[in-house]
Amino acid sequence: SGVLERAAVSWCQRKYNFTFSESEIHYCPSMSFGLAIAIRAFTQPGGKVLMQTPIYPPFTELTKANGRVCSMNPLKFVNGRYEVDFEDFERRAADPDCSLFLLCSPHNPTGRVFSADELNRFVEICAAHDVVILSDEVHSGFVFKGEHAFLPGLSETAARISVWGSS
């Protein structure tokens, strides 16, 4: 391990009180490459990938390009704010063909910052249905109102069932 890995571990410890090993850091040449690898690692051909719309277009494009099916959980626009339809989310997560949830936190393109309670609800639902959470937290540094809750640092279960990415 090198200077960069030590700095990343130290930063997560200070910012989120979350500890992990330097050996758990893996590099990818791009977000698209890393996402494609994760989709192939955690799903089967023809399997479903849960995601929330509106969504960053590469999420759907890469899912389809890798022979998987997009399972869309639309965010509802209510009183000027995007809200999660947890009933629909759980129904989709319970589908035996679904094994991966692509979480964008904060959400891109809406800018929605999920609360720790909402993230914990995602974790509970996904853990109950053996769905891995891939948490794209690349925009976590751009939260201007409220506070970013770091998914893997929320609980042991969250750390166990999630993979996260940042740059």
Where are these regions (language model features)?
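Conserved donor-binding loops in enzymes that form glycosidic bonds
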Residues: 166
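Conserved core of the PLP fold type I
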Residues: 1-124, 141-142, 147-158, 162-163
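Walker B beta-strand of ABC/ABC-like P-loop ATPase nucleotide-binding domains
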Residues: 102, 133-134
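Walker B catalytic acidic pair
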Residues: 137
